[in-house]
Amino acid sequence: MADAQDDMSQMQDKFTYDYETIRKGGLIFAAIAFVVGMLIIFSGRFRCGRKKQLRALNDDM
């Protein structure tokens, strides 16, 4: 009986989570995703089609 309880406690220990590590990893991922998003927005490389519209207007003149 004691052996069965020891086996069950060892199996349950495999599935315990270290919530502090998970939280830190999530915060680091969120910070990196935020910085990458800001770099994309403020890079000036992607202008949502503004350049194409300006070229079309200049070609007509």
UniProtKB/Swiss-Prot annotation:
Name of this chain's protein: Sodium/potassium-transporting ATPase subunit gamma
Keyword Transmembrane: yes
Membrane topology label: Single-pass type III membrane protein
Record text on subunit structure and interactions: Regulatory subunit of the sodium/potassium-transporting ATPase which is composed of a catalytic alpha subunit, an auxiliary non-catalytic beta subunit and an additional regulatory subunit.
Keyword Transport attached: yes
GO cellular component: membrane
Organism: Xenopus laevis
Compartment annotation: Membrane
UniProt record, GO biological process: potassium ion transport; regulation of monoatomic ion transport; sodium ion transport
